[in-house]
Amino acid sequence: MPSSSPDEVKILPAYTLAEAARYVGVSERTLRTWFRGGPAQSTIKGAFRRAAVKPILPTEAGPREPLSFLDLIEAHVLFSLRKSYKFPMAKVRVAMEYLATFGDDLTALAREDFFHDHGDIYLGRDRRLLSLTERGQMADKTILESGLHQITYGSDGYANEFYPLFNNAPQRDFVINPAVNYGYISIAKKGIGADALAARYQAGEKMSDIAQDCGLSLEDVVESIRWHDRLAA
């Protein structure tokens, strides 16, 4: 378990639901349900058709406040579990509810000691794994896979960098780091924001001039503009 709290920059408000949804690759409606829950639905005669949906992912953000970097990471991890491993949403809900019962840090999915197999969620504890979906059962680390190669972790034990997919393909050239470019997408090797490069191009500068001025390749500038256009869509 992390011995310290996450770095403050990781929990600051940073992303609207729409922005976070584009980074993660889900609809804004889906992300809103995960973090805010959903209202009950009723029939015309007033009978309940569906009860109110409780949030799955905890967040300190208020109803209209931006999400933090760690919120973004948790949404990415949840989406990855659902998409890649067909992980039942009910299992995630059980895990979050179990953590809440003993007041543990609720940013479980953004922590380095998070593990998963195809049917359970675990946290590292005392060199073993505590099953959150089996409510306290311990497991052997060797039977599990830790993953999510799009994330790197910091010395605080929490996610530090996020490399979002581009056109559903892994990439390591563009990164989201909460301490760089205000947490927005930037060129990994330089820390230059894709939005800044796109703004210069939109203002009429040639790509080749931008690349030379910033010490970048022409491809870096082209890809930055593509990232900007994709996230602005």
Describe the residue ranges of each PLM region.
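Long, charge-rich, low-complexity intrinsically disordered regions
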Residues: 1-33, 39, 43, 48-52, ...
